[in-house]
Swiss-Prot record:
Plays a role in pre-mRNA splicing and in the regulation of alternative splicing events. Activates exon skipping of its own pre-mRNA during muscle cell differentiation. Binds to the polypyrimidine tract of introns. May promote RNA looping when bound to two separate polypyrimidine tracts in the same pre-mRNA. May promote the binding of U2 snRNP to pre-mRNA. Cooperates with RAVER1 to modulate switching between mutually exclusive exons during maturation of the TPM1 pre-mRNA. Represses the splicing of MAPT/Tau exon 10. The gene is Ptbp1. This is Polypyrimidine tract-binding protein 1. Residues 35-54, 436-458 are annotated as: Disordered. GO terms for molecular function: mRNA binding; pre-mRNA binding; regulatory region RNA binding; RNA binding; sequence-specific DNA binding; single-stranded DNA binding; single-stranded DNA endodeoxyribonuclease activity. The modification Phosphothreonine is found at residue 137. There is a cross-link at residues 64, 217 (Glycyl lysine isopeptide (Lys-Gly) (interchain with G-Cter in SUMO2)). Residues 58-142, 183-259, 362-436, 479-554 form the RRM domain. It is found in: Nucleus. Its main location: nucleus. Monomer. Part of a ternary complex containing KHSRP, PTBP1, PTBP2 and HNRPH1. Interacts with RAVER1 and SFPQ. The modification N-acetylmethionine is found at residue 1.
Amino acid sequence: MDGIVPDIAVGTKRGSDELFSTCVSNGPFIMSSSASAANGNDSKKFKGDNRSTGVPSRVIHVRKLPSDVTEGEVISLGLPFGKVTNLLMLKGKNQAFIEMSTEEAANTMVNYYTSVAPVLRGQPIYIQFSNHKELKTDSSPNQARAQAALQAVNSVQSGNLALAASAAAVDAGMAMAGQSPVLRIIVENLFYPVTLDVLHQIFSKFGTVLKIITFTKNNQFQALLQYADPVSAQHAKLSLDGQNIYNACCTLRIDFSKLTSLNVKYNNDKSRDYTRPDLPSGDSQPSLDQTMAAAFGAPGIMSASPYAGAGFPPTFAIPQAAGLSVPNVHGALAPLAIPSAAAAAAAAGRIAIPGLAGAGNSVLLVSNLNPERVTPQSLFILFGVYGDVQRVKILFNKKENALVQMADGSQAQLAMSHLNGHKLHGKSVRITLSKHQSVQLPREGQEDQGLTKDYGSSPLHRFKKPGSKNFQNIFPPSATLHLSNIPPSVSEDDLKSLFSSNGGVVKGFKFFQKDRKMALIQMGSVEEAVQALIELHNHDLGENHHLRVSFSKSTI
């Protein structure tokens, strides 16, 4: 039982069996005009969402919310994963329903929070799929507030398409969130350099970053970072506070600043105004105006070196970090795609976000496979998008199950978080960590039928070079594929014909304007794109060119 919600129809009280049959019909969840009863002590039980995570749906059920939680905080749970299209608040029951724009976004969100316990206001909350496929809400006061908050967020997100977001959108977001769009960031245990660019890459995943100033105070590397809106600042703080950038060090402490905007005078390696590319570089040292200095009780000019000072304090114990610091975090954060310098550190074995750099079980159990079509090679290619696959074993007596051994635990987490729930050969695969620590090769003479393969020395490994740029381009499965290593003689029609030859539908194609060795191709569905990647990655295009295929974050 997941608590209490109103009757689905107005004016009639249904028995539990009738209500349950309505819930599992996968119709829309209609929030009736009796919504206020649900926020009081109504006793009608809702039996629809009684599973652990459930069957994927755009609608997500959130339970055990703090009684004083705001609509904005609930919306912020979904923002890192895509657009939130509807919200239903049941405050009296400490519950909510979030509707995402796509099932893929909802699936990524649930996968993430399955690994990383979500925390709001210091309280763990619970997230699972709802039986409902969409939400419909009425105009009761509680739902009106939720819709107003949702509209404010959407207007801000629309404004984010341009760096200079409209003042109205920013004001709407400010009114909803009630805080500054400026974050104060302290990096503790600074054993590796954290540059302005690293901060920009990490924090840009939560919204448009307008300005950053870095400085050193009290022997601590600090930064002020201004978003285009306070909603982005809010969910960046919720998601990143207490996280480690690199393994067991460089811990982020994040608070809201008293400032509402930053005044950046120079664009250099210490400060940057992304809305003003015309600013001079100055002397590579940012200066804070007197208002800012007063806010920090600091002199106008901060220390020239952000890495000065040898004594770094121990990691600050943030309650929220306790909810985030679990072994699965590295993989769970992967849908947010923290790239570039941080990913390069991952390739060098330093990334931690938090506490997992090569540690943990590297063997995955993959189930619900199509036994008629799955092969070790297809699993090697697909899982190889997220790490270097060492061995694959399809179980001899249960061919719908397989073991996939990655190079380390972080790669296993990455593959699991991105691929769990996606369709392969017409079936939604399920991926969990295996109890096995390695995949055993068959003994000599043991019947295997080619179901176990060793790929330890495969030339197709994408991440074998330390610091490989491929770590910067890891994305969830999508309908759009990134193609590279295309020879000059191969045309758009050639590639379209190649990708449609296996029954897929090509919906769009575009060569890169500056480099015709690369292109984007859009398939008819995510499942078609997955199949095309498996079949055509490393395809021989002639002229000693083998096609490279990966998932893209872009669309055509």
